[in-house]
Amino acid sequence: MLTPYGYPTILKTACIAILLSGAAHLFAKPLLPEALIFSVFLLLFTLYFFRDPIRTPPDKKRTVLAPADGKVLLVKPVNNHFTGPSSTLVSIFMSPFNVHVNRIPVDGTVTLLSYHQGTFMMAFDHRSLESNEKMEIGIENKELKLHFSQVSGFLARRIICSLQQGEQVERGKRFGMIRFGSRVDVIVPAHVEVTVKAGQHTKAGETVIARF
């Protein structure tokens, strides 16, 4: 299954592959085999990158799900304008080889949606949390306020977020992606227990990262 978020890029890549192979056939036949191999590889990688496997959220109430596939970079205490003091940050790094479709961590209402321009530092550099381009999202329900950010990186310079202010959302549902790697930072309030640690791998919409 492919994500619709990737359709424009897939179409552009297919056109480039066809044009490249056609140009080699017309003007540089000795290079045609290499052009075909490169074109096929480019198209296959693009299809692989925009894959969107089916995910089934666990039947565990009062849990926070990972919004992204990847590896937990760090877990640390922070103060946050949305979740309050003594909150906890869980940062998930997505390599170019991870599934990049992002999913909703908890049921609730979108009460914060704020885009910030910024730099494009390497996503695994912790300074990127503050300085990089990002989309901040806040979800509230009767039991907690959750803050998370789609953060761009050195390669990932296209954040896609389909959420709307005031929208009712369900845990595990798709809401966007970050193209070609980066990170998603989740911040939970003080009363929420984080259940993952640095180095652990996550799957969006399936891995429980906290409980409340």
Swiss-Prot record:
Membrane-protein topology: Peripheral membrane protein
Main location: membrane
Entry keyword set: Cell membrane, Decarboxylase, Lipid biosynthesis, Lipid metabolism, Lyase, Membrane, Phospholipid biosynthesis, Phospholipid metabolism, Pyruvate, Zymogen
Coiled coil: none
Enzyme class: lyase
EC number(s) given by UniProt: 4.1.1.65
GO cellular component annotations of the record: plasma membrane
Cofactor: pyruvate
Pathway field: Phospholipid metabolism; phosphatidylethanolamine biosynthesis; phosphatidylethanolamine from CDP-diacylglycerol: step 2/2
Keyword Lipid biosynthesis: yes
Positions of post-translational Pyruvic acid (Ser) modification: S182
Family: Belongs to the phosphatidylserine decarboxylase family. PSD-A subfamily.
Entry protein name: Phosphatidylserine decarboxylase proenzyme
Catalyzed chemical reaction(s): a 1,2-diacyl-sn-glycero-3-phospho-L-serine + H(+) = a 1,2-diacyl-sn-glycero-3-phosphoethanolamine + CO2
GO MF term set: phosphatidylserine decarboxylase activity
Site feature: Cleavage (non-hydrolytic): G181, S182
Cofactor remark: Binds 1 pyruvoyl group covalently per subunit.
One Pfam family this sequence matches: PS_Dcarbxylase
NCBIfam families: PRK05305.1-2 (NF003678), PRK05305.2-2 (NF003682), PRK05305.2-5 (NF003685)
PTM text: Is synthesized initially as an inactive proenzyme. Formation of the active enzyme involves a self-maturation process in which the active site pyruvoyl group is generated from an internal serine residue via an autocatalytic post-translational modification. Two non-identical subunits are generated from the proenzyme in this reaction, and the pyruvate is formed at the N-terminus of the alpha chain, which is derived from the carboxyl end of the proenzyme.
InterPro entries registered for this protein in UniProt: PS_Dcarbxylase, PSD-A
Organism listed in the record: Chlorobium limicola (strain DSM 245 / NBRC 103803 / 6330)
Record carries keyword Cell membrane: yes
